[in-house]
């Protein structure tokens, strides 16, 4: 039996709903409601719209996993060329949005692609958008230990993983890799580490979250490198249509 949504501790008022947007589908989470839909399923779209309109929801936050972001240091950012930042990362430059990190160091430019707020008829709710990378970056900025060298952070999802690298606590690298199994995960991980001239014996891989479904990945990595984990209530496993995503929950990293 697959894992179900694991409810984290929350400090957010119950009037807020979260919608996780992926490439081919999205997922609503609000109180006891947990439902996924494609962007073309009219029956599900109507069902989700009714849930949001007929409930006490007064704000909806969209968390975007649906396209690769472009990450630009604030001092080099030019708001006038947002579309150009995305041209090398993604084929979609529709509904471009941007975040700025909590530490005011980087701008995150991304395509929202589908404007679900209009599709779902959310004209009375307060709407906000954030890219998944921005949440991840803000989270790590709050928990990273002081280090004199490179720090490697990895978050595994079903079918992909993300790697972030810091040098002396300064962010320097992010990428997402699609993978089939733990062997592909190992290949891409050490390909990146070797490009940064990392010493397998000296440096350590830090996994964001520790979940039983990814034990094979952890065990394989531990044969070639030291590993560690960040574990706390800020992480959830979401099971969307048989796929598992490790999500930084906004409830725990925002006021």
What are these regions (language model features)?
Residues 1-255:
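Hydrophobic/aromatic-enriched cytosolic interaction surfaces used to assemble or bind macromolecules
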């Amino acid at each position: 039996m697959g894992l179900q949504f694991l409810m984290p501790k929350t400090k957010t008022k119950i009037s807020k709903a979260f919608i996780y947007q992926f490439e081919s589908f999205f997922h609503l989470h609000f109180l006891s409601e947990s439902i996924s839909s494609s962007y073309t399923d009219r029956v599900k779209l109507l069902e989700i719209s009714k849930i949001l309109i007929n409930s006490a929801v007064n704000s909806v936050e969209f968390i975007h996993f649906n396209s690769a972001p472009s990450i630009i240091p604030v001092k080099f950012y030019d708001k006038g060329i947002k579309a150009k930042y995305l041209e090398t990362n993604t084929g979609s430059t529709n509904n471009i949005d941007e975040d700025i990190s909590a530490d005011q160091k980087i701008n995150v430019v991304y395509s929202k692609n589908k404007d679900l707020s209009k599709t779902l008829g959310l004209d009375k709710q307060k709407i906000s958008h954030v890219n998944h990378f921005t949440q991840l970056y803000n989270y790590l900025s709050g928990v990273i230990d002081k280090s004199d060298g490179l720090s490697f952070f990895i978050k595994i999802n079903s079918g992909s993983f993300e790697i972030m690298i810091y040098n002396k606590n300064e962010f320097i690298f992010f990428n997402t890799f699609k993978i089939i199994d733990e062997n592909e995960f190992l290949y891409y991980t050490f390909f990146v580490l070797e490009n940064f001239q990392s010493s397998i014996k000296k440096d350590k891989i830090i996994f964001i979250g520790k979940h039983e479904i990814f034990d094979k990945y952890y065990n394989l990595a531990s044969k070639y490198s030291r590993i560690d984990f960040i574990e706390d209530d800020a992480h959830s496993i979401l099971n969307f249509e048989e796929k598992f995503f490790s999500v930084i929950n906004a409830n725990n990293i925002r006021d």
